[in-house]
C-alpha cells in the first residue's frame, strides 16, 4: 500500500 504522502499524489491503494 501507499503512504499518506503518496496517496495525495494518486497512489493506490492507500495504507490505513
UniProtKB/Swiss-Prot annotation:
Disulfide bridge partners, by residue number: 1-15, 2-11, 7-14
Annotated compartments: Secreted
UniProt keyword annotation of Secreted present: yes
Presence of keyword Repeat: no
Tissue expression notes: Expressed by the venom duct.
Molecular-function annotations in GO: toxin activity
Predominant place of localization: secreted
Positions of modified residues (4-hydroxyproline): 13
Domain of life: Eukaryota
Keywords: Disulfide bond, Hydroxylation, Neurotoxin, Secreted, Toxin
Gene Ontology CC terms: extracellular region
Record field: transmembrane: none
Residues making up the signal peptide according to the UniProt record: none
Family: Belongs to the conotoxin M superfamily.
Task of the protein: Intracranially injection into mice does not elicit symptoms.
Domain notes: The cysteine framework is III (CC-C-C-CC).
Protein name: Conotoxin mr3c
Amino acid at each position: 500500500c501507499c503512504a499518506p504522502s503518496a496517496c495525495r499524489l494518486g497512489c493506490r491503494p492507500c495504507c490505513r
